[in-house]
Amino acid sequence: MDKATAVNTCLGVLKGRDCIYLDKVERDGLNNLTFTGDINGHLISQHRDEKDWFRYTLPFRQVLAYFACELDTYENLAETGHLNRSSFDLIEDSTWLKSLPVREDFNKDIYRHYRLFTYDDVYNIIAVSYEFAAEL
C-alpha cells in the first residue's frame, strides 16, 4: 500500500498548496524531467521567513513514467484532502511502480515513485533519482 514520506530538501520539508510554484517543466532526450520555479519562503521547515521566495530547480533523472493532473481533480480522484501536508513526497511501497510492466532488461528496484504538488497540478514521477537545488 502506498505510503507517502515527506522529502527533506535543502529548504526542509515543503508544505501546503501555496508552497511550490511552477514556471516550467522540461523533458530532455536523456529521460530527465526538470521543474523550475519558486518556493514560498513562509511554507518551508528550514530558512523559513528568510526570504519571501526561493528559486528552485528540481531535475528527476532516468524518468521511466510520469503523469500530471490538475490538483483539485487529483484530490477528488484520490479521495483525500492533501492541502496541508508535504508538497514533495517519496511514495514507498508504490502500487503504481509495482504494477508498471517494464522491459525485462530494466531493474525495477532502482526506481522510486515521487509525488510533487504544485499550486495548480500534481505530478507523479517514476525515476531513479532527483536533485533539488534552491537559491539560498
Task: Indicate residue ranges for each PLM-predicted region.
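Surface-exposed, interaction-prone regions used to assemble/regulate multi-protein complexes
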Residues: 1-136
